[in-house]
Amino acid sequence: CPLRRQRQLCIRDRSHAELRPQVAVVGHRPTETLGRGDAERDRVIEELGLREWCDRPAARVSTCVAARMALAEGISSGAPVLLLDQLLAPMTSKWRARAVACVAQVARTGRVVLWAEHALDYALGAADSVVEIIDGHARQVEASSWSSTNLPPTPLQEVAARSGEGIFASPEQAHARLAATALTAVPSPQPQQPKGPVLARVDPAALRLSGGLIDVRAGQVLGIVAHEPVQAHRAARRLAATVRPRGVNDHLLHALLRQTSVQRACDMVDRRADRPVGESMELANKVLGPVGARRGAEHSEGQQRLLANVLACAGGQVVLWVDPGWAVDAASGDHLVQTVRRRGTSVIMASRDVDLVARWCDRVLVVDEHEVVADGRPGSVVADLPYPPQVAQVFPGGHVVRTADVALIPGSKAEGGRAHAQLV
């Protein structure tokens, strides 16, 4: 997503040594301790909530904090070009919105921002144009008119299309504009979600949590979220270990993919799970195409995450996914979820991305410290989520998390034309 290219920078006939000081590459970790210094760096530190972390080494902070530190370092470098690589993947939804605002502010100063990002639901609102590369062919269009033949629309694109608007840069802008045009959201008919058989009924005490019994059902995607992602990860791993004691450890799957070819990793996992050799490879080919001959480490970060999710499916009826949307494009992720659903597999997933939870999950457990504080459909627990999904921000107070949950119609001027939604 290129942002506001107000400065021309010629790179022809320049060596890497000449270009290096002109470009700041921002990944998931800073190159050194952030520290405090000039006014620009201090301002970014405040905006990204890094005051208490700026003097700590990146190795001693969470991945979300480290990614924000990397962005602050890149912005304060003064380089005329910022190259952002999947910046939002490690961040929780709350900080994604803050990071996008910081990047947009940098672009307004005239610096060039080139951003490779799969979390388009946030990044697209800050972009001036989008370069989409399909089968080696690049296509650049204005962000306001961009739509993809390969990727599903973002929630804000869907709301804009259904309301007759061009584009919304943020949920706040969408809410304000819908209210100003007297558009009101009313609930769409909710299809009855099929309830598969209960595979296990777990006492949360076994997970070192308090709360009611937790049902794990066949064909259901159960999301676990928390204010601190590590709490959700811990609860998901304990729940999966309780339901399927012989399941494959997700850390081992990532390590296996780094060390060998995809084909060999799939075969090894199939043998360990006493499944016909070739089943995991068949699923990987369905989701990613023919990838067996290459080593896992040769694939992109998002593809490695998808492959680990595929290998986890060898665990049987219950599958554990930890941050399954990390640097994964929406089309591939949706395809994997649909494929797993058709197989009747139960998925337990921990995620830091509340918009992904809203899109994929049938049920959500919200964990706070040592307690399950909410358990239900994504829309019914929206008030307890660490951060509201974008659709919930467009229609606050309505228990709405998906655009499919509502229909937009002209609102009553007697109600002030307020955009709102209500589920029954």
Briefly describe each language-model feature range.
Residues 123-125, 357-359:
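A short, surface-exposed alpha-helical micro-motif characterized by mixed small hydrophobic
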Residues 40-53, 276-292:
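Conserved ABC ATPase "signature" region
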Residues 148-207, 387-424:
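ABC ATPase nucleotide-binding domains
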